[in-house]
Amino acid sequence: RPLTQHKPHTPGDEHPHGAEPPGXDTALAQIXGD
């Protein structure tokens, strides 16, 4: 799955939502399809 542009994806962490800022969380949800 795509990584966040400003922050690398933590291995084993499939749900970074909540740790990300609301804007990035929304973008990640759309890109990732979560």
Curated annotation (Swiss-Prot):
Coiled coil: none annotated. Expressed by the liver and secreted in plasma. Its main location: secreted. GO terms for cellular component: extracellular region. Residues 1-25 are annotated as: Disordered. It comes from the Eukaryota. One of its GO terms (molecular function) is metal ion binding. It is found in: Secreted. Keywords: Heme, Iron, Metal-binding, Repeat, Secreted, Transport. Belongs to the hemopexin family. Binds heme and transports it to the liver for breakdown and iron recovery, after which the free hemopexin returns to the circulation. This is Hemopexin.
